[in-house]
Amino acid sequence: MKIIKLLAFAALCFPLVASAIDGVELLKKVDRNLEPESYESYRKLINIEPNGAKKEFVIYSVKKGRDQTASLFLSPSSDKGRSTLRQGDNMWLYIPNVGKPMRITSLQSVTGGVFNNADIMRLDYAVEYDVKSAEDKGDHFLLDLKAKTGEVAYDKLMMKVDKKLILPTEIEAYASSGMLMKTLRFKDIKDFGGGIKRPATIETDSPLYKDYKSVMLYSGLKKKDFPDEVFTQGFMSRLEELRK
């Protein structure tokens, strides 16, 4: 009789154990569903001012592994040829005919909009954040993410994850003071081929920049491998070669 009772108790408890959310694995899946570990992409960034005025940038980006990324500005003409490089927490901006690459920070913005450099040169979320908690909210999962170091642009992220697609739908980014810095919304699921199906649009706004808005539109994204040389300061002036 005791054995039967123990088996019955175990059967009741098993669904609770099985339903527990592994937040670390969930975040890793989010990273890989958003992008392959190594890839190339084409994006348009649009900054929208309160009066409706817009400024657009077209950017070619490449990434290798979890913490190396480089980007080349294709337009507007005033920015064409500029490039950025990120290795972990270190970032550089190269401007043609100005000299050697200059250091930049994650909270600055090479495009001058609501997206900062950390957004534009994003690494895997699992590289920069630990999972504090993961909750099942019925129609979505909610991940509470804490920055691993003080070098990360945001101290905390609250990420809503679509249960079926395991992709983010909304991220609130907070400073260490608890102040909301910005909200990012992921929209327009698109099949890019090669098994990549993700939001093609990311919109952001911030209480720090009232009535300003920035939009990131992905037009191309595919898995591609690159040599380590691509992710060095010496290659920043040669990124155009990757497109030939």
What are these regions (language model features)?
Residues 70-79:
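N-terminal post-signal-peptidase region of extra-cytosolic proteins
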Residues 13-17:
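N-terminal signal peptide c-region/cleavage motif recognized by signal peptidases
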Residues 46-49, 189:
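Short, solvent-exposed loop/turn elements at beta->coil junctions and helix N-caps
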Residues 2-9:
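Sec-dependent signal peptide recognition
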Residues 122, 138-233:
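Gly/Pro-enriched, hydrophobic low-complexity segments
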Residues 61-65, 87-88, 107-111, 187-190, ...:
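A short, sequence-level motif marking secondary-structure junctions
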